[in-house]
């Protein structure tokens, strides 16, 4: 094969038609090849066309590979607080809504870092709520789509998601809006799934990059700027940024302006440096208004802040900038400034300068001119694989913080779908005083914690006995040894062991009881004052003691202080759960009665002369937890009502569909349903009844006479009530009621006697 044939073959192959070549091709093409003399000698050393073809292809591929641009991709870097912020946003606001949300990304040139640690896209803890850009950083526009299930994450059409994100860049370039938001050129998208029970976060970043076709290639690589040039450029750029939106800071135009004899440099604006030119910075939009007019090509720079520290590889966002250069600027050759300097080290030049060229040939364009080009951008992991990343936040979190979030999680999930109007803070912030730390008190406290209540105080005077742990869930066997731990102290400690975030304390004291004479006035008064202070300091008072008389004083105090008073009492297979009525704001009588409103006698000593079965709380084991759960749920319902403790009892009305009487929900949108006054349970029949009882004006505990006397005289009133047997009965009016009842009974008996006499001895007329 003679030399001209080799020349023709070489020219044909290197003209991008090699895929059409066969040995029998007979085409008239140029006689001169692209090789010089030394290369001609090399060509003639091949004996066959096939060998030459292979050699030329390899040589050309290597040559193109050397001059082709390789871009340093972004790597994601998420601060731990961001995961917490994303969790809170999902739980408290987004719930089931998985619409994409804006997120702020940041990057910066880090000259001191190794190349593999550069090009970091940082997402700070406040990225979901803040647009603040720290000094030295460049902003990037991001979106995060936090889906509801891991299946949604796996099944997401990731190519379509990437295409949608890239189309936003493409459209902004074509319609010119990119000039207002140049930071869109470095935009990113996050697909994520937050497992809020296990505190694991699965996520995948995409940094959409539009491909240029044909690809841009390095024509040459000019030398770096001098230290003086870099210093002047950095100072001029810093001045320019002060007057421009931070979304423009990452992309700009730069030019060297030399003074001419026709236009000498203004002395006032003359640079203090010894450079023969002045740097001028402009926005990307200024290209179309003639920013580079009259400026030599070697002094024109289309620039971007480059986070890459690779010596020859620019940052990922240059891909999109080059698409803008071709689409908006109509350039096929451009000088790119990969700006890598910062103000602190402006005397050490780091920036990379590239002269790039891309010859547009419509014959070999794979897509239509107005069609979005090929898009890539999903992030690879440390092994170079296209796959998602998983972060386990539990290993970084303080266990107490984990417990805080876990306690609230189930409650907040109620608001996602079932009860969106539920006011959890109203329950969580309610300070609860539990009078009694026994069977009822221990169950109630656990259920209050389940509702998220953070402040629980116990009052009890007893110690843990060996019969308690099986029925009282806060105690165990070791609490019974050596006489038994005090219930109030041990119960509060147990709550903190269960959940360290609860504020629980215990007070060992005996509640002064009606019918029990004072044996130590100083101690009794001290207990009275402590109880009075505790009731003032709490919002909801639970009466969970063993006797009726022990509930009397807290009932009086709670009514006088306007507190929510919750009461539960147990029988063998029955229970009563109720809320006490509160005094209305107008000062009138309470609409609903208290625990004592149905009594016609004042409480008295009920433990005197009791046998063993009467001294112990003998109930079916399931009664206490059932009553406790009803009591806590009743409090939750009360706190959701607009009137809180003054909520009226539900009323019966006829259901138009069933024709049966049903209680009306008041208000109709109450998230938890009814707010009954009393619930009476009958375990033997497995039924409950909702009962409403009005307040009684002669009640020994909540009647105006009793409450007013307590408010006026305080301890003196209580002292007299405990020492004078019939004082409360007389003051409340119950004694008069009893006398009238006796008189009425006597009248009935007398009338019966008279009628009998008349029958025996009829009067003669």
From Swiss-Prot:
Q: Where is the active site?
A: 616 (glycyl thioester intermediate)
Region annotation Homodimerization: where it falls in the sequence: 721-760
What is the official name of this protein in its record? Ubiquitin-like modifier-activating enzyme atg7
Q: Which organism is it from?
A: Botryotinia fuckeliana (strain BcDW1)
Q: What is its main location?
A: cytoplasm
Positions of the UniProt region annotated as Disordered = 646-670, 744-765
GXGXXG motif (motif): residue ranges: 436-441
Family statement drawn from the similarity comment of this UniProt entry: Belongs to the ATG7 family.
Write out the entry's keywords from A to Z: Autophagy, Cytoplasm, Protein transport, Transport, Ubl conjugation pathway
């Amino acid at each position: 094969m003679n030399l001209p044939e080799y020349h023709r073959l070489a020219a044909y192959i290197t003209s991008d038609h090699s895929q059409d070549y066969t040995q029998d091709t007979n085409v008239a093409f140029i006689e001169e090849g692209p090789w010089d003399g030394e290369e001609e000698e090399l060509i003639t050393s091949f004996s066959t066309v096939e060998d030459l073809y292979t050699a030329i292809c390899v040589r050309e591929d290597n040559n193109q590979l050397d001059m082709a641009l390789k871009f340093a991709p972004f790597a994601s870097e998420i601060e731990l607080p961001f995961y917490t912020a994303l969790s809170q946003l999902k739980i408290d606001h987004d719930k089931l809504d998985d619409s994409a949300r804006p997120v702020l990304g940041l990057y910066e040139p880090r000259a001191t870092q190794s190349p593999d640690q550069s090009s970091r896209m940082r997402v700070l803890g406040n990225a979901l709520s803040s647009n603040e850009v720290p000094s030295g950083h460049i902003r990037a526009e991001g979106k995060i789509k936090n889906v509801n299930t891991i299946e949604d994450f796996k099944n997401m059409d990731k190519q379509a998601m990437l295409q949608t994100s890239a189309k936003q860049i493409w459209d902004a370039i074509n319609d010119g809006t990119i000039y207002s938001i140049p930071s869109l050129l470095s935009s990113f998208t996050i697909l994520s799934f937050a497992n809020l029970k296990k505190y694991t976060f699965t996520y995948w970043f995409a940094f959409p990059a539009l491909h240029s076709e044909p690809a841009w290639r390095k024509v040459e690589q000019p030398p770096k700027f001098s230290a003086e040039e870099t210093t002047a450029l950095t100072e001029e750029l810093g001045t320019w940024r002060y007057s421009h939106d931070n979304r423009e800071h990452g992309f700009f135009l730069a030019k060297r302006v030399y003074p001419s004899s026709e236009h000498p440099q203004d002395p006032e604006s003359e640079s203090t440096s010894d450079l023969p030119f002045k740097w001028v910075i402009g926005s990307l939009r200024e290209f179309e208004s003639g920013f580079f007019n009259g400026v030599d090509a070697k002094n024109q720079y289309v620039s971007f802040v480059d986070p890459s520290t690779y010596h020859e590889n620019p940052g990922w966002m240059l891909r999109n900038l080059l698409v803008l250069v071709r689409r908006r600027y109509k350039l096929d050759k451009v000088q790119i400034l990969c700006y890598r300097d910062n103000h602190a080290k402006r005397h050490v030049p780091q920036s990379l300068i590239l002269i790039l060229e891309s010859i547009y040939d419509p014959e070999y364009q794979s897509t239509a001119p107005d069609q979005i080009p090929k898009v890539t951008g999903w992030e690879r992991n440390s092994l170079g694989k296209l796959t998602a990343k998983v972060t386990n936040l539990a290993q970084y979190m303080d266990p107490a913080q984990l417990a805080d979030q876990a306690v609230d999680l189930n409650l907040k999930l109620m608001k996602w779908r079932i009860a969106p109007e539920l006011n959890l803070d109203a329950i969580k912030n309610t300070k609860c005083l539990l009078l009694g730390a026994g069977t009822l008190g221990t169950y109630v406290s656990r259920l209050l914690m389940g509702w998220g209540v953070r402040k629980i105080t116990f009052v009890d005077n007893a110690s843990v006995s060996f019969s308690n742990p099986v029925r009282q869930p806060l105690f165990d066997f070791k609490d019974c040894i050596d006489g038994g731990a005090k219930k109030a102290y041990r119960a509060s400690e147990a709550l903190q062991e269960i959940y360290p975030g609860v504020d629980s304390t215990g007070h060992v004291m005996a509640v002064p009881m009606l019918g029990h004479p004072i044996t130590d006035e100083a101690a009794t008064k001290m207990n009275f004052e402590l109880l009075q202070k505790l009731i003032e300091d709490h919002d909801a008072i639970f009466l969970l003691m063993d006797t009726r008389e022990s509930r009397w004083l807290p009932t009086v105090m709670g009514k006088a202080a306007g507190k929510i008073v919750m009461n539960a009492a147990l029988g063998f297979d029955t229970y009563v759960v109720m809320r006490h009525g509160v005094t209305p704001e107008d000062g009138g009588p309470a609409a609903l009665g208290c625990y004592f409103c149905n009594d016609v006698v004042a409480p008295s000593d009920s433990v005197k002369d009791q046998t063993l079965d009467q001294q112990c709380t003998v109930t079916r084991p399931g009664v206490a937890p059932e009553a406790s759960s009803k009591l806590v749920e009743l409090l939750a319902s009360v706190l959701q009502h607009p009137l809180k403790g003054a909520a009226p009892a539900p009323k019966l009305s006829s259901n138009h569909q069933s024709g049966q009487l049903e209680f009306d929900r008041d208000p109709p949108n109450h998230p938890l349903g009814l707010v009954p006054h009393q619930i009476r349970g009958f375990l033997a029949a497995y039924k409950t009844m909702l009962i409403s009882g009005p307040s009684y004006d002669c009640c020994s505990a909540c009647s105006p006479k009793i409450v007013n006397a307590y408010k006026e005289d305080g301890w003196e009133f209580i002292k007299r009530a405990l020492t004078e047997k019939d004082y409360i009965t007389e003051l409340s009016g119950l004694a008069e009621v009893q006398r009238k009842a006796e008189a009425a009974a006597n009248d009935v008996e007398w009338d019966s006697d008279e009628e009998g006499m008349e029958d025996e001895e009829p009067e003669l007329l």
